[in-house]
Amino acid sequence: MKYTQTTLDKLEAVVEEAGYVLRYERGSFQSGYCILEERKVVVLNKFLQTEGRINTMLDLIPQLEINTDLLSDESKRKYKEVLLKFETEEK
């Protein structure tokens, strides 16, 4: 996966199309993000650069409850790619 703004935009689209609000804010996040499940809000550390934001999204997306029926075809492909990468790293 390339560490470009386009890749980040696609990852953000997956989260947003799944009904989550994605915000970049200051905070003392040990992992670079915070998930507020009840409100479907994801807060990422705004000081991360593009590569850090992408890596954080790759860690974050598999933890979210995502209904793939809500995703566009492009977002479904990106979501499956992220899950495959996550499963590969877990082994």
Question: Would you name each region that the model predicts?
Answer:
Residues 26-51:
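Active-site scaffold of zinc-dependent metalloenzymes
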Residues 53-62:
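Short alpha-helix carrying the canonical HExxH Zn2+-binding catalytic motif
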Residues 31, 51, 64-91:
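Post-HEXXH active-site segment of zinc metalloproteases
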Residues 14-15, 21, 41-43, 82:
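Extended aliphatic helical segments
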Residues 41-44, 61-65:
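Short, low-complexity, polar/charged sequence segments that are solvent-exposed and flexible
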Residues 1-30, 91:
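Auxiliary, metal-adjacent structural segments of Zn-dependent hydrolase domains
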Residues 2-3, 45, 67:
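Short, solvent-exposed coil/turn linker segments
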